[in-house]
Amino acid sequence: MAPKAEKKPASKAPAEKKPAAKKTASTDSKKRTKTRKETYSSYIYKVLKQTHPDTGISQKAMSIMNSFVNDIFERVASEASKLAAYNKKSTISAREIQTAVRLILPGELAKHAVSEATRTITKYSSAAN
């Protein structure tokens, strides 16, 4: 058996292994996309301009209104979910939402909310056809 040929030295010295650096926002080559925060600001602003065209709203007031809408949404959704569970249904329908609104909002406010919602849904349905 012939002796093994000696290996020729590599023309370039092998690169030294660098210790793995911890990835942080500053060293990461990819730019992090800013997470989108969903708010009701644009809708609140549109309603404000429909009712009071010459009135503005501060950032703090908009934040308060956004929190208010989120709170009411959570309350109605939670109550509607309970109502659906009581009736052994897995779907929240308009009836559950309407009943939840009547339970959560007091007196006249509930009546006005239900009538406005009914009117708006009727208007939306007729526009879609």
From Swiss-Prot:
Name of the protein in its database record: Histone H2B.1
Chain positions with N6-acetyllysine modification: 7-8, 12, 17
Subcellular location: Nucleus; Chromosome
SUPFAM superfamilies referenced in this protein's UniProt entry, alphabetically: Histone-fold
Pfam families referenced in this protein's UniProt entry, alphabetically: Histone (PF00125)
Region (Disordered): 1-37
Source taxon at top rank: Eukaryota
GO cellular component, one term: nucleus
Post-translational modification: Monoubiquitinated by the UBC2-BRE1 complex to form H2BK123ub1. H2BK123ub1 gives a specific tag for epigenetic transcriptional activation and is also prerequisite for H3K4me and H3K79me formation. H2BK123ub1 also modulates the formation of double-strand breaks during meiosis and is a prerequisite for DNA-damage checkpoint activation.
Function field: Core component of nucleosome. Nucleosomes wrap and compact DNA into chromatin, limiting DNA accessibility to the cellular machineries which require DNA as a template. Histones thereby play a central role in transcription regulation, DNA repair, DNA replication and chromosomal stability. DNA accessibility is regulated via a complex set of post-translational modifications of histones, also called histone code, and nucleosome remodeling.
Glycyl lysine isopeptide (Lys-Gly) (interchain with G-Cter in SUMO) crosslink residues: 7-8, 17-18
InterPro entries referenced in this protein's UniProt entry, alphabetically: Histone-fold, Histone_H2A/H2B/H3, Histone_H2B
Gene3D superfamilies: Histone, subunit A
Family: Belongs to the histone H2B family.
Organism: Meyerozyma guilliermondii (strain ATCC 6260 / CBS 566 / DSM 6381 / JCM 1539 / NBRC 10279 / NRRL Y-324) (Yeast)
Cross-link (Glycyl lysine isopeptide (Lys-Gly) (interchain with G-Cter in ubiquitin)): 123
Subunit structure: The nucleosome is a histone octamer containing two molecules each of H2A, H2B, H3 and H4 assembled in one H3-H4 heterotetramer and two H2A-H2B heterodimers. The octamer wraps approximately 147 bp of DNA.
Stretches assigned to coiled coil: none
Main location: nucleus
